[in-house]
Every structure is written in structure tokens, then in C-alpha cells.
Amino acid sequence: IGRRLLVRGRAIARPGIKIDINLERPKSLGTVRLASSDPLVSPLIDPNYLSDQQDIDHMVKGVRVMSEIMSRPEIAQYHQGSLGPWKNVTSDAEIISAIRATAYTGHHPACSVRMGTNNDKMAVLDNQLRVKGVEGLRVCDASAMPSQITGNLYATVIAIAEKAADMILGKKPLPAEYPEEKINA
């Protein structure tokens, strides 16, 4: 409960409760494509949010759980109900419409230039973070992740950058702390 409620980035001058439902590992995949061979031209980015039915199903379930919690007498006494597109929403179709009207990114894009094996057709980077087919170019940020992590990207991106620095400098990896033969013995 706060002094100002933020709705789609705008402050509403009254107390309120804001609840976010997050898909930490969405199935929907977007695309980043070159618009031109000119490096100064912005790429074509399509995040393709909520394109996978499983993502929609999880969001609807999250809304239903949140609604059930907020309708409990212990909490309901502190609020007057939902606002905007969420007011009087009950059916799955209404929930999906409200989700599509209010969904936004968590601003943690990742996996758009993912690392993978030579057999992985979706992988842009090899296991040394080098762009396949391009000499002298590596990527060492969240886009190199093969799959989305659950949680904030910051520490993982630092680890990727540290590993990339070691690769560029030609440092050998540290030996395994627990070699497999000792684990299985």
C-alpha cells in the first residue's frame, strides 16, 4: 500500500495496491532482424509477447490466484476493487483482453543472440561467445544466454563478461572443483 498508485507508468494521486504477475520463463519468442546492411539503421525488433498459448494460460491462472487472494476479507477491507481495464473482469476472455491492454516488459531482454552448439540452428554464438561465421566479433551480454534465467540478469551478465574476458585473453578455464569421477565414486 502506497501513497501513489502507478498505472502504466502514470501516477494516480490516491493510495492503492499494485500487483504484478510475471512470466519469468516465457515460451513466446521474439525476433531481432537486420533492416539494412547499414550498421546505423536500427534493427527490426518484434518481442512477440504473449504469442504462446502457454504464456496466456499462466497469466490467466496468475490473475485468478491474485483475484482470489485480494477478495479474502483480510485484504478486501483495504481496497475497493480493480481499476481501468481490470474493473469488473471475470471471464477468461475479459482477463486476456485486460492482460493484452496492460502487459509490459520487465526490461530484461535476453537470449536474442544465444550461445549453443554447432548443431543448434537457433544459436548465433559458439561456445566461446563468437558470432558464427563472423571473424573477430563476440557477444557477452544477456543476449548470449541460451535460455531465460529466473531472477535479475545483472549478476549473470557480469559472470558472462568475466568469462568472455578470460576467453579473449586466452586464459585456461579453472579445473573442475569436483571432477565427475569423484562425484560418481
Describe every region a protein language model picked out.
Residues 1-156, 164-185:
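FAD-dependent oxidoreductase catalytic-site/capping-region signature
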